[in-house]
C-alpha cells in the first residue's frame, strides 16, 4: 500500500468562496445577492466555524486511531447506506466491455461449437471469470500493482479490499441503515441463469485459482445453463428481492431468518459472502439494439409473457433479464451472444476502481487466447518476480473439501414469499418502464483532435458540449455534477466538479448567437475549458467545496442538531439548487469499454456517462422519458458545429479573403437545428 497524505480539509473561507463562485452562474442577480448575504452573515460564519473546528478535531482523532482513513469516508458511506429506495437505477452503474475479437459470434460458430447456441457465451464468461480470479489472487497476495496517475503519482488502493466478497445488507431490526459486509475469506462464486442460482468454489485455501484456464471452467458454466433450462420456468426468482426498497427487503430477510426451515437463510448467507455473481443471460442483442443492451446491463429488461399456455400467472410472467440479477453485489453479466459488462454496488467502490478491474480482465481475457497459441505472451497478472499468477492446477492438499462442481440453491416458498416475489417483480417492471436510454457514438473525432486542433482539454471540452445541448433544448442552465477522483490521498473518494461557470455560459450563448464571430466563439471556448480544468485540478487536490460542506452538515446532523441551529447556508435556496444535479455526468474513458452509464439522480434530470477515445466519443444518456434522443442529437450537432467553426477559422487564416456561400449556408442550417428548442419551449433564454 502506498504511503499517502491525508485528504486535506480546506480553510473554511476558501470553501465558502468556492461555493459562492460555483453557485453564482446558476442564479440571477437578486438570488445571488441574497445568497451572499446569507453565506457571509455573522450567524452563518459563527455556526460554520464551530462545526469546522469540530471537523478538524474529528479528523485529528481519526488520523491517530486509524491512519488509513479520511474525514469524509464515513459520512460518504452513510450517504449510500442510509438511502432507502431501490439501488436499481439509483445507485448501481454499469460498464460494458468491448467485444472479444477472438470469439466469433456467428450462426456457424454456434452450430459448430461444443456448447451449441451457448458456445460464445460460455467461452466469454469463462475467460472473464478466470481473469477476475487472477485479479482477486493479486489483491489477496498483496501483489496488485499500485494505481498511478500517468505512471507517477500513486493512488490509494483501499477500495480493492471491498470489491470482492462484499454485499450491501439491508438494515436489521432496529438498525437505522444498511451496512456493507465484506468476507475476506470468500472462495466461491454464484452463477445465475433464468433467475436460478448455483455456486461452486473457485479459489483454494491459498487464494490460488482452482480453474487456472478458461477451458477448465467452461463445463461448469455450461452445465449450469443446461440444468436451469431443464428445470423450466417454475423456480422462484429470489434475485428480484434485491430490487426492492431497503425497508421491504429488510422485512423479507427478517422473515427468512425467523422461518422454521433455514434453507432460504443459508442460501442468502452463501450469496452474501460470494466473491461476485456471474449473470448468464438467456438473451442476445444485435448491433442495432445497443439502447436495449444498455438497459439490460444497467437495470435489466422487462419482458412480459401473458401466454397462459407457457406461464402460470402471477409468477413467471416476467421473462426479462431484470430477474437474473443480484443487485447488492458486483455482477459480471454475459449475454447469449457474448456481450459482457459489469454492474456494481457503488457504496464501497468508485468507478476508477472498477475501471481498473475491467481493464485488466479484458486485457487478460484477450491474452489468454494468445497464450493458447504461444507461451511467449506477457502475463499481466504475473508477480513482480515474473512468476505466473497461478499454477496450472491448485494442489490437492489446498483443494481438499472444496466444492468445484456447481450446486444449485433450492428455495422454499410459501404464500407470503410468493406474493412478495410477485409484487417485487411488478414494481421493478414499473420502474424499468419509466426510464429510457440513448447511446451516442460520435466517430468524427475524439481526444486527439480536441487536443491538437481545438487546443482544449478533452474532458473540459465535452462538458461544454453538454451545456450547449441542454441550453439549446431548454434555454437555461442547470446544476451539472462531475466527480473528480481524490484517490491521490489516503482513502480518497471523489469531489464534485461544478461545470457551469461564468465562462461556460458566455461560450454557450455565443455558440448559439449567429452574430458572434467564430474567433469570439473559439476564444470563449478556450476560456470555458481553462476554467473547467482549473476547477478539476483543485477538486483532485481535495480543494473543492461540496465534500467539506457536506461533512459539516453531517457533523451538525449527527451530533449538534440539538445544540446548534442549522447554519443558514444549509437553509438557503442555493444549497437545494446545488444538490439538485439535473445533469449528472461522469467520464470513465478506457479503450476496453464499449459504453458506461447510470440513471439520472433527479426526477427531471439526465444521467450522462461518457468515454472519450482518441478518435471518437461515446455517450450514454438516461432519463425518465425526457427528450433523451433529442438531447443526444443536440450533443452530436454541437460537436459538429464546433468543428466547423474551427475549420472556417483555419480557412480564413489560410485565405483571408475567402468567404464561400457553402460555409455560410452550412452554418445557417446547423444553427437552425440547435436553436429549434427555443421555438418549442416557452422558457426564458437569458439565464
Swiss-Prot record:
Which PROSITE patterns does its entry note? ACYLTRANSF_C_1, ACYLTRANSF_C_2
Recorded GO cellular component terms are: mitochondrial inner membrane; mitochondrion
Q: Does the keyword Mitochondrion apply?
A: yes
What would you give as a GO molecular function for this chain, any one?
carnitine O-palmitoyltransferase activity
Q: Membrane topology for this entry?
A: Peripheral membrane protein
What start and end residues bound the annotated signal peptide? none
Quick one: which residues bind CoA?
A: 446-459
Q: What induces it?
A: By ethanol and by acetate. Repressed by glucose, and to a lesser extent, by galactose. Derepressed by glycerol.
Q: What is its EC number?
A: 2.3.1.7
Which coarse location class applies to the principal site listed for this UniProt protein?
A: mitochondrion
Instruction: Return the InterPro entries for the record.
Output: Carn_acyl_trans (IPR000542), CAT-like_dom_sf (IPR023213), Cho/carn_acyl_trans (IPR039551), Cho/carn_acyl_trans_2 (IPR042231)
The active site consists of: 346 (proton acceptor)
Q: Which residues carry this modification: Phosphoserine?
A: 517
- Compartments it resides in: Mitochondrion inner membrane
The alphabetized UniProt keywords are: Acyltransferase, Fatty acid metabolism, Lipid metabolism, Membrane, Mitochondrion, Mitochondrion inner membrane, Phosphoprotein, Transferase, Transport
Q: Which domain of life is it from?
A: Eukaryota
Catalytic activity reads:
(R)-carnitine + acetyl-CoA = O-acetyl-(R)-carnitine + CoA
Function (record text) = Involved in the transfer of acetyl-CoA into mitochondria. May also be involved in the metabolism of acetate and of ethanol.
PANTHER family the UniProt entry points to: CARNITINE O-ACYLTRANSFERASE (PTHR22589), MITOCHONDRIAL CARNITINE O-ACETYLTRANSFERASE-RELATED (PTHR22589:SF29)
This chain belongs to the protein called Putative mitochondrial carnitine O-acetyltransferase
Species lineage:
Eukaryota, Fungi, Dikarya, Ascomycota, Saccharomycotina
Amino acid at each position: 500500500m502506498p504511503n499517502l497524505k491525508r485528504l486535506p480539509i480546506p480553510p473554511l473561507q476558501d470553501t465558502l468562496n468556492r461555493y459562492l463562485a460555483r453557485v453564482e452562474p446558476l442564479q440571477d442577480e437578486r438570488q445571488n445577492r441574497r445568497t451572499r448575504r446569507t453565506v457571509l452573515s455573522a450567524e452563518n460564519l459563527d455556526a460554520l466555524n464551530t462545526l469546522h473546528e469540530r471537523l478538524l478535531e474529528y479528523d485529528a482523532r481519526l488520523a491517530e486511531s486509524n491512519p488509513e482513513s479520511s474525514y469524509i469516508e464515513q459520512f460518504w458511506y452513510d450517504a449510500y447506506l442510509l438511502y432507502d429506495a431501490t439501488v436499481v437505477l439509483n445507485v448501481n452503474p454499469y460498464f460494458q466491455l468491448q467485444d472479444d475479437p477472438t470469439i466469433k459470434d456467428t450462426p456457424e460458430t454456434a452450430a459448430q461449437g461444443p456448447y451449441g447456441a451457448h458456445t460464445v457465451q460460455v467461452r466469454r464468461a469463462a475467460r472473464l471469470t478466470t481473469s477476475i480470479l487472477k485479479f482477486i489472487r493479486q489483491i489477496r497476495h498483496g501483489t496488485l500493482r499500485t494505481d498511478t496517475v500517468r505512471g507517477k503519482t500513486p493512488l490509494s488502493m483501499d477500495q480493492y479490499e471491498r470489491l470482492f466478497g462484499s454485499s450491501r445488507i439491508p438494515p436489521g431490526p432496529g438498525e437505522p441503515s444498511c451496512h456493507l459486509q465484506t468476507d475476506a475469506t470468500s472462495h466461491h462464486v454464484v452463477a445465475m441463469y433464468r433467475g436460478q442460482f448455483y455456486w461452486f468454489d473457485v479459489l483454494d485455501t491459498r487464494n490460488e485459482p482452482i480453474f487456472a484456464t478458461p477451458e477448465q471452467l467452461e463445463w461448469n458454466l455450461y452445465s449450469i445453463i443446461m440444468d436451469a433450462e431443464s428445470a423450466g420456468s417454475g423456480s422462484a426468482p429470489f434475485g428480484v428481492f434485491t430490487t426492492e426498497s431497503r425497508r421491504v427487503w429488510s422485512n423479507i430477510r427478517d422473515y427468512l431468518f425467523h422461518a422454521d426451515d433455514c434453507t432460504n437463510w443459508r442460501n442468502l448467507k452463501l450469496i452474501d459472502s460470494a466473491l461476485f455473481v456471474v449473470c448468464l443471460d438467456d438473451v442476445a442483442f444485435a448491433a442495432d439494439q445497443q439502447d436495449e443492451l444498455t438497459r439490460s446491463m444497467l437495470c435489466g429488461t422487462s419482458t412480459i409473457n401473458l401466454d397462459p399456455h407457457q406461464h402460470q400467472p402471477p409468477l413467471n410472467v416476467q421473462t426479462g433479464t431484470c430477474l437474473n440479477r443480484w443487485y447488492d453485489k458486483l455482477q459480471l453479466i454475459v449475454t447469449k451472444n457474448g456481450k459482457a459488462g459489469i454492474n456494481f454496488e457503488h457504496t464501497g467502490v468508485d468507478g476508477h476502481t472498477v475501471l481498473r478491474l475491467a481493464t485488466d480482465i479484458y486485457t487478460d481475457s484477450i491474452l489468454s487466447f494468445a497464450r493458447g497459441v504461444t507461451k511467449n505472451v506477457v502475463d499481466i497478472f504475473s508477480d513482480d518476480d515474473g512468476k505466473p499468477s497461478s499454477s496450472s492446477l491448485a494442489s490437492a492438499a489446498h483443494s481438499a473439501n472444496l466444492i468445484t462442481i456447481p450446486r444449485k440453491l433450492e428455495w422454499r416458498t410459501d404464500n407470503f414469499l410468493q406474493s412478495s416475489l410477485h409484487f417485487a417483480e411488478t414494481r421493478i417492471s414499473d420502474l424499468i418502464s419509466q426510464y429510457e436510454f440513448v447511446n451516442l457514438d460520435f466517430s468524427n473525432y475524439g481526444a486527439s483532435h480536441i487536443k491538437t486542433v481545438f487546443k482544449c482539454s478533452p474532458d473540459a471540452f465535452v462538458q461544454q458540449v453538454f451545456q450547449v445541448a441542454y441550453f439549446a433544448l431548454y434555454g437555461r442552465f442547470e446544476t451539472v455534477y462531475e466527480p473528480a477522483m481524490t484517490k491521490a490521498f489516503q482513502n480518497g473518494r471523489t469531489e464534485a466538479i461544478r461545470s457551469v461557470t461564468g465562462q461556460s455560459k458566455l461560450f454557450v450563448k455565443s455558440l448559439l448567437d449567429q452574430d458572434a464571430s467564430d474567433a469570439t466563439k473559439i476564444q470563449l471556448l478556450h476560456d470555458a475549458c481553462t476554467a473547467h480544468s482549473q476547477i478539476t485540478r483543485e477538486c483532485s487536490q481535495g480543494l473543492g467545496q461540496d465534500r467539506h460542506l457536506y461533512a459539516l452538515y453531517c457533523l451538525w446532523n449527527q451530533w449538534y442538531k440539538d445544540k446548534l441551529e442549522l447554519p443558514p447556508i444549509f437553509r438557503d435556496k442555493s444549497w437545494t439548487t446545488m444538490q439538485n444535479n439535473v445533469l449528472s455526468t461522469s467520464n470513465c474513458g478506457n479503450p476496453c469499454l464499449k459504453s458506461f452509464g447510470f440513471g439520472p439522480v433527479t426526477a427531471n434530470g439526465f444521467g450522462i456517462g461518457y468515454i472519450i477515445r482518441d478518435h471518437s466519443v461515446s455517450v450514454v444518456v438516461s432519463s425518465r422519458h425526457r427528450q433523451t434522443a433529442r438531447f443526444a442529437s443536440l450533443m452530436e450537432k454541437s460537436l459538429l458545429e464546433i468543428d466547423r467553426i474551427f475549420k472556417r477559422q483555419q480557412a480564413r487564416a489560410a485565405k483571408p479573403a475567402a468567404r464561400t456561400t457553402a460555409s455560410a449556408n452550412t452554418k445557417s442550417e446547423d444553427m437552425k437545428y440547435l436553436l429549434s428548442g427555443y421555438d418549442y419551449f416557452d422558457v426564458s433564454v437569458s439565464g
